[in-house]
Amino acid sequence: MRIAFDINGTIRDTFLKAEQLYQKFYIDEYEEDNVSVYDEEKDDFISQENDESFEYGLDLPVKSLDHLENHFKFKDKDDLFNFFYVDFPMQIFGHAPSVEVSTFNELNEIYEELRDNHEIIIVSDEIGKSKPATLFFLSKYGCLVEKIKFYSNITIDSMWDEIDILITSNPNHVLNQPQNKTVIKCTTSYNEDVKSEFTIKNVGEFKELYKKLNLE
């Protein structure tokens, strides 16, 4: 049996780090006359006069992955994309905390207990520089899982082809579960209203659910 853990929301608290960075660079600094703006050519932040025509703001917790612009307010979707994947990918995806202090201890224990009978996989929806940032995140916390697969909206079918059970916080995966696949929802603010046959609150709870599923 191939058991996969999805990173965002299940293992990594991505939006907490994004909130901290947004607060610092788009709210706190925009209260001043000059703000810091990332310059790709110089690979550094430069001082720029404040544009008061747009009001930045946060609306949290995140309730929808499909409408992040409602929670992290930018002038357009390109600016939202750049925030996550161009300007701050290492800070957001690499330096984000784990969902709980014990998350990686629990994950590594699951890996060590099940690896002889099952293939344990880490999967994650990543774009561009968020991939190396995610590898840094996993190494930072001492993740022992050997197989890591990145996917996107274009390659998601290949992700499903390589797994049998998915532990995820992504509501789209719960709602679009393929036949003959098992999806276990890990509860977050943005999937509370999505029904799932199997639900856990954190990675550690998978241990008890595994026994009930009788996968030996």
Annotate each predicted stretch with a short phrase.
Residues 1-75:
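Active-site neighborhood of HAD-like aspartate-dependent phosphohydrolases
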Residues 148-152, 198-208:
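Short acidic-hydrophobic, aromatic-tinged amphipathic segments that line or gate anion-handling sites
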Residues 125-179:
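Substrate-recognition "cap/lid" segment bordering the active-site pocket of phosphatases
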Residues 74, 78-121, 129-132:
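Short, acidic loop-to-helix structural element flanking the phosphoryl-transfer center
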Residues 157-160, 206-216:
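Short amphipathic alpha-helix with an adjacent loop that forms part of the alpha/beta core around
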